[in-house]
């Protein structure tokens, strides 16, 4: 796909991996719609890249459809990047009792159901696109995590939500093959995001040192570069790519 002139939706685009991806897509000539709950930050990012912002709870059918409608009003919607998500930490049984079921449910709702909600709505719109010369009508990228494979203590909810994203990658790609729509997933390792930067510096340094090579935290640009390559490489479909510097997480 030639990115220039196409319309892309980036959920969670107000910060972190989503913001980095939105900025890189814009630098390549894309029209970007940022969908996020953080209105002030999202609006600021959208304004700085000449894009659009729509406040969105990705698990809401109404909110998701509003984002897709806005994107389609700008031109040909050809790409989705699902970066919106939460990362709660709670043990199955802790000092205060069993894992809060509401917290587990919320994590699944935002991370897994939210990702699928945006996929299904974007795919519906993309299926009506006039195909490119290659037959392609759109590309969708979701964000899992290496926690889907190497979940640590306290990550039952988070790992379940990201494992669900991994599990639905191939069947969705197969579902949408006849529509000329590709579906991919990126599973990031330890990345420098606002959540991680809230940790003490010594914790950040220890996490970075645990990455075999390069021994550093991943950056939003690392993620964005891979997302751009996925959009541009027509043979990438139905696969999960670990972007982790070869790290494998220990139990804690």
Label every PLM stretch briefly.
Residues 109, 202-222:
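Catalytic Tyr-x(3-8)-Lys segment
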Residues 124, 173-175:
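Alpha-helical segment proximal to the catalytic Tyr-Lys
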Residues 177-182, 236-239:
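Short, small/polar-rich loop/turn modules that mediate ligand/substrate recognition or access, typified
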């Amino acid at each position: 796909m030639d990115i220039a002139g196409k319309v892309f939706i980036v959920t969670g685009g107000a910060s972190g991996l989503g913001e980095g991806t939105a900025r890189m897509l814009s630098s390549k000539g894309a029209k970007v719609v940022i969908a996020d709950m953080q209105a002030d930050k999202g609006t600021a990012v959208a304004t700085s890249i000449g894009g659009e912002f729509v406040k969105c709870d990705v698990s809401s059918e109404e909110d998701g459809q509003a984002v897709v409608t806005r994107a389609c009003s700008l031109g040909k919607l050809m790409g989705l990047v699902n970066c919106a998500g939460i990362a709660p930490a709670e043990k199955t049984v802790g000092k205060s009792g069993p894992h809060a079921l509401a917290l587990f449910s919320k994590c699944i709702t935002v991370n897994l159901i939210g990702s699928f909600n945006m996929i299904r709505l974007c795919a519906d719109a993309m299926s009506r696109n006039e195909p490119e010369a290659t037959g392609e009508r759109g590309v969708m990228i979701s964000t899992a995590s290496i926690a889907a494979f190497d979940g640590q203590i306290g990550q039952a909810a988070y790992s379940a939500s990201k494992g669900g994203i991994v599990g639905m990658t191939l069947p969705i790609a197969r579902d949408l093959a006849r529509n000329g729509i590709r579906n991919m997933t990126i599973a990031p390792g330890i990345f420098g995001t606002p959540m991680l930067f809230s940790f003490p510096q010594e914790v950040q340094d220890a996490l970075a040192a645990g990455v075999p090579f390069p021994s550093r935290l991943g950056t939003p640009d690392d993620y964005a570069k891979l997302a751009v390559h996925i959009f541009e490489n027509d043979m990438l479909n139905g696969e999960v790519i670990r972007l982790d510097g070869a790290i494998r997480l220990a139990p804690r």
